[in-house]
Amino acid sequence: VGEGGTAAPCAAIAAARQGTRTALIHARPVLGGNASSEIRIHISGADQSLKQTDYAEGGLVYEMMLDNKACNDDFCYSIWDSVLFEKAKAEKNLTVFFNTVMYDVETDGDRISAIYCFQETTEMRYRFTAPLFADCTGNGTLGYFAGAEYRQGSEAKSEFGEPTAPEEANNDRMGNTI
């Protein structure tokens, strides 16, 4: 699983819970991406406007939020970092590689077969192979390295039927997670 924003621990934990030996590779020293103590943008997600009362986060995000609420009522971001770390550490099939930058991929046809990484704190180089990789970078970094098509900006409401999407596609980008 590439990177450590909110989506990455969810993907990695889900894979590990299904019995898959999983590596979570993150360039930073804490999980959470923009929602970590490094950036401090809260997870707004499905209820981002606080007006969409029919929408809420579920699954692992909700599980993490409940764990956080139990020990972090004032929402201290450093404690949130610890909640995410402990959640990942609790999974026996999951290994987290902090301070590890992905810099290249190998492909076999149209599939990624390996990724190359450098761990800055140990100066170790890694080559990870797997039948499946999850690009949770937020920027599509693995896909970009592999030559995948990509787009930037917001899609029009008509493209995917999202009720809160703009009427017309645009180049706007979000500054927060989920």
Segments from the language model and where they lie:
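N-terminal Rossmann-like FAD-binding beta1-loop-alpha1 element of flavoenzymes
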Residues: 1-23
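Core beta-strand elements of the Rossmann-like FAD/NAD(P) dinucleotide-binding domain
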Residues: 122-132
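Short beta-strand segments that buttress and anchor functional surface loops
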Residues: 114-119
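A secondary-structure boundary/capping signal
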Residues: 2, 26-27, 98, 129-130, ...
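Glycine-rich loop(s) and the adjacent beta-strand/alpha-helix scaffold that form part
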Residues: 135-178
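Stable alpha-helical elements in mature extracytoplasmic
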Residues: 8, 80, 84, 138-142
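Short, solvent-exposed loop/turn and secondary-structure capping segments
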Residues: 12, 33-40, 127-128, 140-149, ...
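Conserved N-terminal/central alpha/beta ligand/cofactor-binding core
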Residues: 14, 20-21, 26-111, 151, ...
